[in-house]
């Protein structure tokens, strides 16, 4: 969820140099199926937490951009790479009106709200844990509980707000571990034994394999019930009917992207891969598909439970909020209603033209490279 897949040093440098922009809406050519002319397009500025857009993670945005779903919903989607050097950038930019929708981790979201940045989650991309721990292949660690007293590599010291609650959930005092802020080389630190573990996440595993890094993993979904990165907006916008309508339409486009992906994962991967020139230099189509499938399965967590795409799970959030309050990451126990809402999520799931997305996916023509790829047996979302 956090990093790119060309040379990691290059990507992080690019992220640190500033928030690169990519104008998704300008790439569209689809007509105005819902009676909205191109002149009436409203911009939604979405900001990544990674400092790069060159990853397969955002397939649920690239598909509606390239298939014209956002445009037919009256939206020009602008994707902003953000900055990897400022852990709170994806909420700060929203609060400062430099972006409309952020993609913060739960730790960044709650730390931001606690510090007075008035944002709220309207969409939990994964209603469960997305983060993992990467280990050297010869590591004797077999359980995440064995991380007590170990060295854990991070890309930024700001990622501590992500890992601390995970450790508490495991019964580990965060003060017992040593964090190694290794910048762009944080995964290499684990691979080479300079750290005992490194923070990782679904979607990254296949990308690292594509770079030749040899690692094994403690998969977070097997032992954690905490939530993951969300789409968050300004609280003040949720009191504005026009903004609520705009963001609900944006989420309808996201739902269509997910339904398209579910119906034809290889087509979604081809669309996303084709949108990312730097990624194509270092990741072959099969590994790109594998990376996307790791995340696509996770993105379907709440959908598979019958709660629709993007559901904020109250129980998981309540447990998480208590842990971060006990840790002192927040000065007080944040009220659940200050952190999440499912109001837009429920409407978006009902109103999205899922049937069109599925039909488009089934007739989408694969190129020879993606026609040769294979979807992992048992994949579901």
Question: How would you describe each model-predicted region?
Answer:
Residues 318-381:
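Conserved C-terminal helix/tail region of periplasmic/extracytoplasmic solute-binding proteins
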Residues 10-33:
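N-terminal export signals
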Residues 241-333:
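Secondary-structure end/capping motifs
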Residues 178-181, 189-197, 208-217, 226, ...:
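A residue-level marker of the well-folded mature domains of exported/periplasmic proteins
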């Amino acid at each position: 969820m956090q990093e790119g897949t060309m040379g990691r040093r290059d990507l992080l440098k690019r992220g640190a140099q500033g928030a690169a922009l990519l104008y998704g809406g300008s790439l569209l050519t689809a007509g105005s199926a819902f009676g909205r002319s191109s002149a009436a397009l409203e911009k939604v500025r979405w900001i990544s937490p990674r400092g790069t857009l060159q990853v397969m993670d955002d397939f649920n945005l690239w598909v509606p951009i390239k298939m014209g779903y956002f445009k037919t919903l009256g939206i020009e989607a602008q994707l902003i790479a953000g900055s990897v050097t400022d852990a709170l950038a994806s909420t700060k930019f929203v609060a400062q009106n430099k972006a409309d929708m952020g993609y913060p981790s739960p730790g960044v979201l709650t730390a931001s709200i606690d510090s007075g940045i008035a944002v709220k989650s309207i969409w939990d991309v994964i209603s469960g844990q997305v983060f993992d721990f990467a280990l050297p292949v010869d590591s004797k660690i077999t359980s995440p509980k064995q991380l007590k007293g170990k060295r854990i590599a991070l890309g930024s010291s700001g990622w501590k707000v992500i890992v601390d609650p995970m450790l508490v959930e495991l019964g580990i005092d965060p003060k017992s571990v040593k964090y190694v802020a290794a910048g762009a080389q944080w995964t290499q630190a684990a691979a080479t034994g300079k750290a005992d573990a490194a923070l990782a996440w679904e979607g990254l595993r296949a990308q690292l394999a594509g770079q030749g890094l040899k690692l094994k993993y403690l998969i977070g979904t097997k032992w954690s019930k905490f939530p993951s990165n969300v789409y968050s907006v300004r609280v003040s916008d949720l009191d504005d009917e026009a903004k609520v309508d705009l963001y609900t339409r944006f989420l309808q486009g996201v739902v269509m992207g997910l339904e398209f992906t579910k119906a034809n994962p290889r087509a979604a991967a081809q669309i996303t891969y084709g949108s990312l020139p730097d990624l194509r230099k270092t990741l072959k189509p099969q590994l790109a598909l594998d990376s996307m499938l790791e995340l696509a399965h996770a993105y379907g967590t709440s959908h598979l439970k019958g709660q629709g795409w993007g559901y904020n799970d109250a129980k998981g959030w309540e447990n998480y909020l208590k842990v971060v309050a006990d840790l002192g990451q927040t000065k007080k126990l944040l009220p659940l209603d200050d952190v999440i809402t499912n109001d837009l999520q429920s409407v978006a799931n009902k109103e999205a033209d899922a049937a069109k997305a599925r039909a488009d996916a089934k007739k989408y023509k694969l190129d020879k490279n993606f026609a040769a790829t294979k979807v992992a047996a048992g994949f579901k979302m």
